[in-house]
Amino acid sequence: MKIVENQPVVRRQSPQAEVTLTLPARPEAIAFAPQETALIVVDMQNAYASQGGYLDLAGFDISATAPVIANIKRAISAARAAGIKVIFFQNGWDNQYVEAGGQGSPNWHKSNALKTMRKRPELMGKLLARGDWDYDLVDELQPQAGDIVLPKPRYSGFFNTQLDSLLRSYGIHHLVFTGIATNVCVESTLRDGFFLEYFGIVLADATHQAGPQFAQQAALYNIETFFGWVSDVDSFCNTLAAPLSQTA
């Protein structure tokens, strides 16, 4: 039987935190300060969310990604209005795939993009290659001034990227996750953040799995039970809107 706390989780907050909000979540609510929080948008690229992109070509079902894109767009708008830093990730490598690692890297053997290109050589240089359509963020989710865009060469957004140093420089402790794929890059990044003392929250309806539905369910179970918290876009937007409406 899972243990559920009745009180919200409250991190020891910095003296400069002006506003503290409480987000309904599983397994319990969690308090956060907007100025100490980042919204992480994981790999919302054509590769993962568009017909003809890498996941689609590799045989994964992406038919349900349109509502996810719409929900992420709502979450981004709410975050920007509340002063929450928005960070976009783009997964991939150079068009020669030197950064992907050769046969001495497990990435070479496990990356479905690399395996798909080995099966279909005509796709070489087109999947997850910087500068190509597949690598680009979807049209609906484009960065604005003040947002951060980070490339990442592996599943975790903390591995060989500036993420940790940027978060520390901005005094950020809470990470709200959206994006694709829940069971791969989202969960990998949240887990690594947990080990670095970041509080990770996933907005479930702003994520999508690579694989069958049970992969989504298993990832969310792991996160809420062992590594973080699970909420939804309506709760996130409503929580952020409350103090804004009071000052209007």
From Swiss-Prot:
Annotated catalysed reactions: (Z)-3-ureidoacrylate + H2O + H(+) = (Z)-3-aminoacrylate + NH4(+) + CO2; (Z)-3-ureidoacrylate + H2O = (Z)-3-aminoacrylate + carbamate + H(+); (Z)-2-methylureidoacrylate + H2O + H(+) = (Z)-2-methylaminoacrylate + NH4(+) + CO2
Gene Ontology molecular function, alphabetical: hydrolase activity, acting on carbon-nitrogen (but not peptide) bonds, in linear amides
Keywords of the record: Hydrolase
CDD domains named among the record's database cross-references: cysteine_hydrolases
Annotated Gene3D superfamilies: Isochorismatase-like
UniProt keyword annotation of Protein biosynthesis present: no
GO process terms (BP): nitrogen utilization; uracil catabolic process
Leading EC class: hydrolase
Short name of one Pfam family: Isochorismatase
The protein's Enzyme Commission number: 3.5.1.110
UniProt-annotated catalytic positions: D43, K152, C185
Similarity section: Belongs to the isochorismatase family. RutB subfamily.
HAMAP family: RutB
Biological role stated in the UniProt entry: Hydrolyzes ureidoacrylate to form aminoacrylate and carbamate. The carbamate hydrolyzes spontaneously, thereby releasing one of the nitrogen atoms of the pyrimidine ring as ammonia and one of its carbon atoms as CO2.
Protein name: Ureidoacrylate amidohydrolase RutB
Source organism of this protein record: Serratia proteamaculans (strain 568)
Gene: rutB
